[in-house]
């Protein structure tokens, strides 16, 4: 991901898609530009923007860089395995999302970005809904002097199908030390 991002002068944030949004049985592009990047972010540290707020910090940061005319890259070619929101106890589920926390979370983003964000009721809970269409015109721009290589560099990787239990299933395989 970093090698890909380094080709461009204006990619501010990049990261992998959640595996549950990129099912292997579906056809996806290698990446999607100018949308949100959740949880696992590769960030250009020269940005003037910093984390802020209590909720949706990743979405807020993405929206601020997109509004500056920069780009984000969400990779489908690489995914991250993460438990679906509010399916595990602890962390944000207990601290931020209990009681009216889901509504507060959604409303905070709508208040920060009323031009593109609103509160909606989806999946039996309050959610934020962001319209990323205004950022379609943010075009990826190669760095000065970058020459695209000929051919395909697979970096020594092979695509294989692995039928193993999920990292979050109770039957996940562990080694002798108890590590995955």
Model-derived features: positions:
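Conserved catalytic core of nucleotide-sugar-dependent glycosyltransferases
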Residues: 1-64
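C-terminal catalytic/acceptor-binding lobe
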Residues: 53-55, 59-180
């Amino acid at each position: 991901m970093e090698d890909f991002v380094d080709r461009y002068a204006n990619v501010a944030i990049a990261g992998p898609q959640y595996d549950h949004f990129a099912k292997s049985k579906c056809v996806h592009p290698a990446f999607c530009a100018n949308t949100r990047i959740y949880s696992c972010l590769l960030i250009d540290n020269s940005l003037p923007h910093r984390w802020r707020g209590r909720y949706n910090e990743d979405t807020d940061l993405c929206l601020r860089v997109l509004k500056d005319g920069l780009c984000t890259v969400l990779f489908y070619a690489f995914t991250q395995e993460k438990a679906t929101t509010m399916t595990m106890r602890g962390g944000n589920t207990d601290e931020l999302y209990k009681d009216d926390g889901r509504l507060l979370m959604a409303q905070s983003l709508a208040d920060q970005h009323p031009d593109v964000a609103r509160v909606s009721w989806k999946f039996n809970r309050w959610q934020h809904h962001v319209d990323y269409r205004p950022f379609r015109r943010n075009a990826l721009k190669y760095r000065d002097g970058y020459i695209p290589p000929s051919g395909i560099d697979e970096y020594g990787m092979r695509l294989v199908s692995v039928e193993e239990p999920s990292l979050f299933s109770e039957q996940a395989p562990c080694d002798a030390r108890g590590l995955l």
